[in-house]
Amino acid sequence: MNELARLSSEIGTDVLTISQGMGLDSRIGPQFLRAGVGYGGSCFPKDTIALLNLAKRHGVNLSILEKVREVNATQPLWFLEQLHKQMPDLYGKRIALLGLAFKPDTDDIREAPSLTIMDALQRSGAQIVAYDPVASNHVKELFPDAEYTSTPEAVFQGAHAALLVTEWKECVELDWAKIMEMMEVPLLFDGRNAWPARGSGIFLSGGWKKLTTPLQESWLFLLAR
C-alpha cells in the first residue's frame, strides 16, 4: 500500500479508496491495507529478517519480502521529501512532530519511523519540537537537542510545519481552528491518514497538493489522500 500511496500522490488518486476497494475482495480483506510512514517495533523487523535469512540458507529468493523491507526503510524519508517539496530549506525552521513511539499505546521506540525522521530533520538544521505522551524520555536520550512538550497542542506554537507520525488519540482529536492560529505556517503532513480531511471547515479533501479554505490559506498534506 505504501508504494500505491507514492503513485497516488503523483497522479492525484485516493489511496484510501484504493485500499477500501481491495479490501472488499474476500481473498484479501481490509486488514493491514493502510498506507503510512512505515512499521517499526521489535516484531516485524526481526521476523522479516529471520525469514529472509532462513530462505537464503535454503537457496530460496523471497524477492517480495525483500522489497517490503526496502520500501519500509525508505518510507519515512519519502514522507520527508513531501515536506522538502514545499519547504526546500529547513534550516532554522521549527518542525513539529506528533507521536514518537512506533505505534500508539506503547513507549516502544525500537525501529520507530520517528527516529529516521528526526535524524533527517536534524541533519537539515531544522528545529525539532516533539510530543509523545509516554515515549519522549526515551527519544530525548537519542536527540537531546530537540524540544519536547507536555501537550500535543504546544508543538504547534510557532511551527512552520507539523508531521503526524504516530496516531495517538490526543494527537488526532485537536481544536483545529486554534491550531491554525498557533502555527507560523499552517503546513500539515499526515503520516497516518488520521487527521480530518472533510467537513471541519479547515480541511478540504485532496491529496499532496496545496489546498485553500474559506477561512484562511492553509495546507493539508494527507498521505496520498
Located regions from the model:
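Structural/interface elements that position substrates and couple domains in central-metabolism enzymes
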Residues: 1-216, 223-225
